[in-house]
Amino acid sequence: MKAVALPIQPPYPVMDAELVGELPRGREWQYEPKWDGFRCLAFRNGETVELQSKSGKPLARYFPDVVAMLKSLSARRFVIDSELVIPVDGGTSFEELQLRLHPAASRVRKLADAHPAVMIAFDLLVDASGRSLAAKPLKDRRKALERFHADFAKDVKRLRLSPATTNIKQALEWLRRAGNSLDGIVAKRLDLGYRSGDRTGMVKYKVIRSADCVVGGFRYLEGTKLVGSLLLGLYGEDGLLHHVGFTSSIRDEDRKALTARLVKLRRPPGFTGRAPGGPSRWSTERTGEWEPLKQVLVVEVAYDQFTGGRFRHGTKFLRWRPDKAPSQCKFDQVERRSPGPEAIPVRLR
């Protein structure tokens, strides 16, 4: 990244959030939607614009549309903390964001033209006068961000102000009405400054969803003959069973009995549609040999996101579902529901 003559320089560690099982309550907390996108710090000084990822890596080459949008603002100095999302079919698409991470500039430009990204701003670290706000409490930074947006981006469709509230009921209502389109809720202490590289005073509550899946196969635990992971499938409209992910959260004391049960059910093909081992940008499991199973077992798993036809991360085993027919395990239970225009108070198009 280029040097930027501002009080805050890239790479700058972002303030991160601690994962919690329940949102904190109290008027000292501000609640915001947890968008399903790419965290992005945006730096501008004159004609120099840099975008930084959560991990500190440069993003500008992958989002030329965002760089151009920021250069179009009359404010010539600022640092904004934000989330990049790509609106598709009334919702947002994490898969489209992933496609931007391509080495060919021509491909990136084509993707940007087809699906421009939107920046959802939720913090202002350097204002238009070039003054650092990082040490100021969030309540003051939020007011400054709202003034900045009103003065410089009110009519800019691809720079949106993330909604915020001190009413926890309102925050939970966003989750309820937005369906699967939000990743959760973030809560921030209003009295604290921006804690770069720290998790103090900022927590995230993630939505955990569940789905019933067919066990189409399994993999052995490395170096053993005990089951290591169950391979999960869902039936598509084509009537085929497609591999959508895995769960490896099996208790050690259950592995021997479960392995014996699964071995008796070994039968190809296991998956009649998309099978394990194919390319996937979400895969975190090691590809390799797997054992196909007769399509009779149904398991309920917990997951955070389902994108691009599969679970983005490994799922958590919840329970067996002997009461559920495999044919009932379809994609409709995991498809992302797009929010209506009233679901959350920010329009992406």
Over which residues does each language-model region extend?
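Catalytic cores of nucleic-acid ligases and guanylyltransferases
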Residues: 1-349
